[in-house]
């Protein structure tokens, strides 16, 4: 398990773009992670998406999955951004949205390592709310030394 202070050691993102609140399961040997994002009506994106019917933007759900995958990648390599390594989101495959994410939801983020070739990492990711899938994708990240 990782609290927000440890998460901040493994992700360079900060408010309002840090989209992982807690890691509840991390298995480096099994190459998988489970984390969550508490979605509050106070999120800045709800001011414009959409004021009368607030829905979490899909691109931010994708970003939240990518951040969870990034934590897994850092842990698998046993490095942190402070060590001079970053992961950049470079793409996704097999992306599907299944239902909207609303204020008050707890977004569960799961990522499993698929492969790494020439510092290009691929993860199978899923986001769910109340046990129901809301988004799935293969997330592709590039590992870069600073």
Curated annotation (Swiss-Prot):
Task: Give me the Gene Ontology terms describing cellular component.
Answer: cytoplasm; membrane
> What reaction gets catalysed by this protein?
a (3R)-hydroxyacyl-[ACP] = a (2E)-enoyl-[ACP] + H2O
- Provide the alphabetized UniProt keywords: Cytoplasm, Lipid A biosynthesis, Lipid biosynthesis, Lipid metabolism, Lyase
Tell me the compartments it is located in: Cytoplasm
> Any idea which residues are catalytic in this one?
49
| Class of this enzyme | lyase
Gene3D superfamilies (alphabetical) = Hotdog Thioesterase (3.10.129.10)
Q: Which family does it belong to?
A: Belongs to the thioester dehydratase family. FabZ subfamily.
UniProt name for this protein: 3-hydroxyacyl-[acyl-carrier-protein] dehydratase FabZ
């Amino acid at each position: 398990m990782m609290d927000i202070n440890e998460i901040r050691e493994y992700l360079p993102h900060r408010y309002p773009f840090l989209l992982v609140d807690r890691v509840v399961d991390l298995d480096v040997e099994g190459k998988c992670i489970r984390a969550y994002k508490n979605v509050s009506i106070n999120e800045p994106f709800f001011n414009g998406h959409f004021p009368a019917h607030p829905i979490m933007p899909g691109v931010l759900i994708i970003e939240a999955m990518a951040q969870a995958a990034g934590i897994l990648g850092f842990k698998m390599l046993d490095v942190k951004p402070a060590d001079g390594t970053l992961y950049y989101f470079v793409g996704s495959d097999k992306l599907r949205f299944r239902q909207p994410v609303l204020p008050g939801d707890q977004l569960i983020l799961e990522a499993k390592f698929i492969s790494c070739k020439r510092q290009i990492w691929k993860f199978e990711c899923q986001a769910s709310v109340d046990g129901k899938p809301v988004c799935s994708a293969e997330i592709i990240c590039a590992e870069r030394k600073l």
